[in-house]
């Protein structure tokens, strides 16, 4: 009230009224600007003006019990006068200093856990090494890069559910945590953050950094993995670069790198199998990368690479609409074309059937080490502007563009026959034939292309057929630029289809990707890749194939044994025996197979000749298409360790060694597993023990279905009959006893009855 009286008093004086009306501040617009709305219009001025006051801060009353009235220097820390319009206390900035020095200390145990990404960044920088600074023109191209090292790969929605569950577990709202990674992270974080006093909002922000991939479209020359991007401002300017080696790796970069390697291996392997698409899917579903299922990573990881995109397409996921040719990503930026089949003659008079694109089109081409802009018409290159790291990279881009243009002079530059094949020994399509041909040697192509005088354009220079730069002349339509071409920024994903030969097409039928586009580069994965599929056994060489094949038979022996006696053909056709065939000398594969199949048939016919170990040992040889011959073998050859090694038909060898006492099988000296059943105990032991509670009725009776293994007998109901396969590969009919009392006598009768049933 005092203040208001004072103001009224002031207003009654004519001088006050004059000052307020005559000075320019009465401009209504200005007064409105600074007084309307809650948004501060000049924060820095407001801050300076506030801080110049004695008590610019307000705080809850209880702070007066925690802070003394005066500090050590005798300066007042808070005012006894209440803040006008609220029941808070007015406080001096000196109080903040006092609090920072003398206030209570909370537990810091949660800080490294919450601010994990920051702590890890500091460690990486501490251990990173910065090299010399070089001054040179930087060819930067904008790429979509990951700016947030050390994150998991959850989608925004998945992360939101995890954060809500961790930070606000009691809030209402449906949250369904479904994926493996969501559940693991939630459990881990809840444990880490027990009794955490950091504000929930801050915790939520920091969790988001840890869980979600954040990407930006940034100009980059050099490394694009997130540990390089976080120091982009330190490593490259407009005309300089600083060498840098990160002081640590992060899992997200490792996942991206390992995913690419796994996908390339899988696509290459699938391409040579009988049904590439089915094989690819089987391998993707049975592979783990760093302990996470590959299919889960593919669903979440936005990496764009040819092999990765083929795997995604096979799983029915959307991929980028750009297409790949010669290792470059092409994105059409304008124009359109229609396809028409045309027959053309090469310089060697070989006929090629080309799918010619008719119409004017412009493309950006982005590769690992070079980029370009390409303008073309029907079978004519109009202009190509290339930029690249070095001469080799520029050559690669020019060759790809010239082939892509489908110009006649390119086709006429072919010398010799085109007969390139893919990994499965199938002829490549004509465009890839041409590409391979000129990638091997582009000399004739460049010589035949033709040259033209050029105008002097800033930042552009000509290039001659021998790859020397020139300011006067250049290959027709081709220029080299200092500036890179940005990657296509649009991250839209489109629905695609894939055929059984792994060719990926968009909805208009244009081929975006095919196995020919998958890089042959071999790398060493950062995370462990576990391929459970038998198709990938050969990735670690012949020894691995040998060991894995025998391990698989031993692991699945119960079912293998039944198939061996009931349905051998189905067993021989199992894909698990496919890799083994590459170890058997081609010329003799058929004879081995015929010999082993005949031997097995005798075992089935002549009772008592069933020999578990021999069946396991010879089974993989029976998988090849058999040739009928009267040849007998005492040993079979496999090609491992660079030479032929022998497996003895009867008895042990270094390749296949079974120890009867320990029941362990070693293959090439490495453990291949233990046989759970005992192959040598005659009819009595195991079977009679297991057949307790069953009555043996006689020989096999097909009406009661296929033979069960001894392990499957437990599922029978009392009084139910079934055929059962006993250790010797013989099948008998049994019935589960209706009463338990007579079980003891069963094991004695079983032995006699088995003998009778067999004989």
From Swiss-Prot:
Gene3D superfamilies named in the record: Polymerase Basic Protein 2, C-terminal domain
UniProt-annotated location(s): Virion; Host nucleus; Host mitochondrion
The entry's keywords: Cap snatching, Eukaryotic host gene expression shutoff by virus, Eukaryotic host transcription shutoff by virus, Host gene expression shutoff by virus, Host mitochondrion, Host nucleus, Host-virus interaction, Inhibition of host innate immune response by virus, Inhibition of host MAVS by virus, Inhibition of host RLR pathway by virus, Inhibition of host RNA polymerase II by virus, mRNA capping, mRNA processing, Viral immunoevasion, Viral transcription, Virion
Record field: transmembrane: none
Top-level taxonomic group: Viruses
Keyword Ligase: no
One GO BP annotation of this record: cap snatching
Statement: the UniProt record of this protein carries the keyword Transcription regulation: no
Segments carrying motif Nuclear localization signal: 736-739
Annotated signal peptide: none
Gene Ontology CC: one annotated term: host cell mitochondrion
Family annotation (InterPro entries): Flu_PB2_2nd, Flu_PB2_6th, Flu_PB2_C, Flu_PB2_CAP-bd, Flu_PB2_middle, Flu_PB2_N, INV_PB2, PB2_helical
Subunit text: Influenza RNA polymerase is composed of three subunits: PB1, PB2 and PA. Interacts (via N-terminus) with PB1 (via C-terminus). Interacts with nucleoprotein NP (via N-terminus). Interacts (via N-terminus) with host MAVS (via N-terminus); this interaction inhibits host innate immune response.
Record function comment: Plays an essential role in transcription initiation and cap-stealing mechanism, in which cellular capped pre-mRNAs are used to generate primers for viral transcription. Recognizes and binds the 7-methylguanosine-containing cap of the target pre-RNA which is subsequently cleaved after 10-13 nucleotides by the viral protein PA. Plays a role in the initiation of the viral genome replication and modulates the activity of the ribonucleoprotein (RNP) complex.
Protein name, as recorded: Polymerase basic protein 2
Organism: Influenza A virus (strain A/USA:Memphis/10/1996 H1N1)
Gene: PB2
């Amino acid at each position: 009230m005092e203040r208001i009286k004072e103001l009224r008093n002031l207003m009654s004086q004519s001088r006050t009224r004059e000052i307020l009306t005559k000075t320019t501040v009465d401009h209504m617009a200005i007064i409105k600007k600074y007084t309307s709305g809650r948004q501060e219009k000049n924060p820095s001025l407001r801050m300076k003006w506030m801080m110049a006051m004695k008590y610019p801060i307000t705080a809850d009353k209880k702070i007066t019990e925690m802070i003394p009235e005066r500090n050590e220097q005798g300066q007042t820390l808070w005012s006894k006068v209440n803040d006008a319009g609220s029941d808070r206390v007015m406080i001096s900035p000196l109080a903040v200093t006092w609090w920072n020095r003398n206030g209570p200390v909370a537990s810091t145990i949660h800080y490294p856990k919450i601010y994990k990404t920051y702590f890890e960044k500091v460690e990486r920088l501490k251990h990173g090494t910065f090299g010399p600074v070089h001054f040179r023109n930087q060819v930067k191209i904008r790429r979509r890069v990951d700016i947030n090292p050390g994150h998991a790969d959850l989608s925004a929605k998945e992360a939101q559910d995890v954060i809500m569950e961790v930070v606000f577990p009691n809030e209402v709202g449906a949250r369904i945590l479904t994926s493996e990674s969501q559940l693991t992270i939630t459990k881990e974080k809840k444990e880490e953050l027990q009794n955490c006093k950091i504000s929930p909002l801050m915790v939520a922000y920091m969790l988001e950094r840890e869980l979600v991939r954040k990407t930006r479209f940034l100009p980059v020359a050099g490394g694009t993995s997130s540990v390089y991007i976080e120091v982009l401002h330190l490593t490259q300017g407009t005309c300089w670069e600083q060498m840098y080696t990160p002081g640590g790796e992060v899992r997200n970069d490792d996942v991206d790198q390992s995913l690419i390697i796994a996908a390339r291996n899988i696509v290459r392997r699938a391409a040579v199998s009988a049904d590439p698409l089915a094989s690819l899917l089987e391998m993707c579903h049975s592979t783990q990368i760093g302990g996470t299922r590959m299919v889960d990573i593919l669903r979440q990881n936005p990496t764009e690479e040819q092999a990765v995109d083929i795997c995604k397409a096979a799983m029915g996921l959307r991929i980028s609409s750009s297409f790949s040719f010669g290792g470059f990503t092409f994105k059409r930026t304008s124009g359109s074309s229609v396809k028409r089949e045309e027959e053309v003659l090469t310089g060697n008079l070989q006929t090629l059937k080309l799918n010619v694109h008719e119409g004017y089109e412009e493309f950006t081409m982005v590769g690992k080490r070079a980029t370009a802009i390409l303008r073309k018409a029907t079978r004519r290159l109009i202009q190509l502007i290339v930029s690249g790291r070095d001469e080799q990279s520029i050559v690669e881009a020019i060759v790809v563009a010239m082939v892509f243009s489908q110009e006649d002079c390119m086709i006429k530059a072919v010398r010799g026959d085109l007969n390139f094949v893919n990994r499965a020994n199938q002829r490549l399509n004509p465009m890839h034939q041409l590409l391979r041909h000129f990638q091997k040697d582009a000399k004739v192509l460049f010589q035949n292309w033709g040259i033209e005088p050029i105008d002097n354009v800033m930042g552009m220079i000509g290039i001659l057929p021998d790859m020397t730069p020139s300011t006067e002349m250049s290959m027709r339509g081709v220029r080299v630029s200092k500036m890179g071409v940005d990657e296509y920024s649009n991250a839209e994903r489109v629905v695609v289809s894939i055929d059984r030969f792994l060719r990926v097409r968009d909805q208009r039928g244009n081929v975006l990707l095919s196995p020919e586009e998958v890089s042959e580069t071999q790398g060493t994965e950062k995370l462990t890749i576990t391929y459970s599929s038998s198709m990938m056994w050969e990735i670690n060489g012949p020894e691995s194939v040998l060991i894995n094949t025998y391990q698989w038979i031993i692991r699945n022996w119960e079912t293998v044994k039944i198939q061996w006696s009931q349905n051998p053909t189905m067993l021989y056709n199992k894909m698990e025996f496919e890799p083994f065939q590459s170890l058997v000398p081609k010329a003799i594969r058929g004879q081995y197979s015929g010999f082993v199949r005949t031997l097995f048939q005798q075992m089935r016919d002549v009772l008592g000749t069933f020999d578990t170990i021999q069946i396991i040992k010879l089974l993989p040889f029976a998988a090849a298409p058999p040739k009928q011959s009267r040849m007998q073998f005492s040993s079979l050859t496999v090609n491992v360790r660079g030479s032929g090694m022998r497996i003895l038909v009867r008895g042990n060898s270094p390749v296949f060694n079974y120890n009867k006492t320990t029941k362990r099988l070693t293959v090439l000296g490495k453990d291949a597993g233990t046989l759970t059943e005992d192959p040598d105990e005659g009819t009595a032991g195991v079977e009679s023990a297991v057949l307790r509670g069953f009555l043996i009725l006689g020989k096999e009776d097909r009406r009661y279905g296929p033979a069960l293994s001894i392990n499957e007998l437990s599922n029978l109901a009392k009084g139910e009959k079934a055929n059962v396969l006993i250790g010797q590969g013989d099948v008998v009919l049994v019935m589960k006893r209706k009463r338990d009392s007579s079980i003891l006598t069963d094991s004695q009768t079983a032995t006699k009855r088995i003998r009778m049933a067999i004989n």
